[in-house]
């Protein structure tokens, strides 16, 4: 497993986090108290019913493996944003516990007020500890709370990449004090995939960074400008880069105040012999709506009242060729308004090219996952990151606190 440094790292890294898989293989978990920080933050409807149980299903292998090894298992997660220090039925993990019971084929009791201990979990049994964000001090990474939680366990397992960018008591503090701290299978898989994509990538390395605003992705763009061979921009971000290249974009969404930043990124790439491909054709409309008429235009023919809502077919074909020839692909964001089919061709063509490419591909971000689902390519993307904000912060080159503390523990 690799460390999360963006520099070139060896495959046998002494500071890579310890893993649950290694502990299970060593056979030392029988009778041990194992505390798993999972990501069970699932969407619910107005009645509180779970609408997508993907995260719960993803958490089952780690829990089941610990139970099979004879461990006494405690699982917790956040759910929504409850007020700290008070019970909040709207954010209770009760529905999660019911679904977890079904998936594990056994009762999973839900415990409230658990931070002070006073409960026993027999080996081979599992309990769900109520929403960790109800505990005073969770979000501020309280040292006192972290030590109380660490006293409950012999082994701490972080299996929640989605919160790895937050230093909270259950993601960071407890890992400092637990007798053993390690990465669960979901977290370990994310570390491996991200390390493979940016630590030692097979070249050419192509990144697709798309979205409505340059401002929200500027740090990512600057970070990747030093690393990638082609930086494909899409959506409103591409409009700003087109402006920077001296092209007209009509009344399209753009950020003129960031033109200097866009030009700087183009220059950094060019100095390295890398490129930011600027579209040669685009799909325009006079309004932003599901029924808007789409018109394919050469980039030099965009009218003052046009809105650019997708890349054109020539651009899509050109970029698809680059993706098919890539060694590594990092994908964050659809290149057009793919929710409206007449503006979805660019994203569809690129998605298909990623699926057909021999490159190792990693994709992340909510809109990207929706596009992957729409075009049915999930089983042909090398790795789909569920991290959201953590995935973006990794692309920015930031240290993720939850991973950093596990690396520190491994090093010591």
UniProtKB/Swiss-Prot annotation:
Gene Ontology molecular function terms on file: ADP binding; ATP binding; phosphoglycerate kinase activity
Does the keyword Transferase belong to this entry?
A: yes
Question: Record's family?
Answer: Belongs to the phosphoglycerate kinase family.
Q: Which organism is it from?
A: Cupriavidus necator (strain ATCC 17699 / DSM 428 / KCTC 22496 / NCIMB 10442 / H16 / Stanier 337) (Ralstonia eutropha)
Entry GO CC: cytosol
Major enzyme class: transferase
Q: Provide the E.C. number(s) assigned to this enzyme.
A: 2.7.2.3
Supply the PANTHER family for this chain: PHOSPHOGLYCERATE KINASE, PHOSPHOGLYCERATE KINASE 1, CHLOROPLASTIC-RELATED
Encoding gene, per UniProt annotation: cbbKP
Chain coiled-coil ranges: none
Question: What GO terms describe the biological role, i.e. biological process, of this protein?
Answer: gluconeogenesis; glycolytic process; reductive pentose-phosphate cycle
Q: How does the annotation summarize its subunit structure?
A: Monomer.
> What does the record give as its pathway?
Carbohydrate biosynthesis; Calvin cycle
- This protein's source sits in the domain of life called Bacteria
Keyword NAD applies: no
State where the protein is found.
Cytoplasm
By its UniProt entry, which InterPro entries does this protein fall under? Phosphoglycerate_kinase, Phosphoglycerate_kinase_CS, Phosphoglycerate_kinase_N, Phosphoglycerate_kinase_sf
Q: Which UniProt keywords apply?
A: ATP-binding, Calvin cycle, Cytoplasm, Kinase, Nucleotide-binding, Plasmid, Transferase
Catalysed reactions listed for this entry: (2R)-3-phosphoglycerate + ATP = (2R)-3-phospho-glyceroyl phosphate + ADP
Q: What is this protein called?
A: Phosphoglycerate kinase, plasmid
Q: Which residues bind ATP?
A: 217, 339, 365-368
Q: Where does substrate bind?
A: 39-41, 55, 78-81, 133, 166
């Amino acid at each position: 497993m690799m460390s999360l440094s963006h520099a070139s790292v060896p495959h046998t890294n002494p500071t890579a986090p310890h893993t649950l898989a290694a502990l299970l293989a060593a056979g030392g978990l029988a009778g041990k108290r194992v505390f798993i920080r999972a990501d069970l933050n699932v969407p619910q409807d107005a009645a509180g019913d779970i609408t997508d149980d993907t995260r719960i299903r993803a958490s089952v292998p780690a829990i089941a493996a610990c139970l099979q090894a004879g461990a006494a298992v405690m699982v917790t997660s956040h759910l929504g944003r409850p007020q700290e220090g008070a019970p909040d039925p709207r954010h209770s993990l009760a529905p999660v516990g019911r679904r977890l019971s079904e998936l594990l084929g056994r009762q999973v009791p839900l415990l409230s007020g658990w931070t002070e201990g006073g409960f026993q979990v027999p080996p081979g049994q599992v309990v769900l500890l109520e929403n960790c964000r109800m505990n005073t001090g969770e979000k501020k990474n309280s040292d006192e709370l972290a030590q109380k939680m660490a006293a409950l366990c012999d082994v701490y397992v972080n299996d929640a990449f989605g919160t790895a960018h937050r230093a909270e008591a259950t993601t960071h503090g407890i890992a400092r004090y637990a007798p053993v701290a390690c990465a669960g299978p979901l977290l370990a898989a994310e570390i491996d995939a991200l390390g493979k994509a940016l630590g030692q990538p097979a070249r050419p390395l192509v990144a697709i960074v798309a979205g409505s605003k340059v401002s929200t992705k500027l740090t990512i763009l600057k970070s990747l400008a030093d690393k990638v061979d082609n930086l494909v921009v899409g959506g409103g971000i591409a409009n700003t880069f087109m402006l920077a290249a001296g092209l007209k974009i009509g009344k399209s969404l753009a950020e003129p105040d960031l033109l200097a930043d866009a030009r700087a990124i183009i220059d950094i790439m060019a100095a390295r012999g890398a490129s930011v491909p600027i579209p040669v054709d685009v799909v325009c409309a006079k309004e932003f709506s599901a029924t808007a008429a789409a018109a394919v235009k050469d980039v030099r023919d965009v009218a003052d009242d046009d809105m650019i809502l997708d890349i054109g077919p020539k651009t899509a074909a050109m970029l698809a060729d680059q993706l098919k020839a890539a060694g590594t692909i990092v994908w964050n964001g659809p290149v057009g308004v793919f929710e409206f089919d007449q503006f979805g061709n660019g994203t569809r063509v690129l998605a298909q090219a990623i699926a057909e490419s021999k490159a190792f591909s990693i994709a992340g971000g909510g809109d990207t996952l929706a596009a992957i689902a729409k075009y049915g390519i999930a089983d042909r993307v090398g790795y789909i990151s569920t991290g959201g904000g953590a995935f973006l912060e990794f692309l920015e080159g930031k240290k993720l606190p939850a991973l950093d503390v596990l690396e520190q523990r491994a090093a010591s």
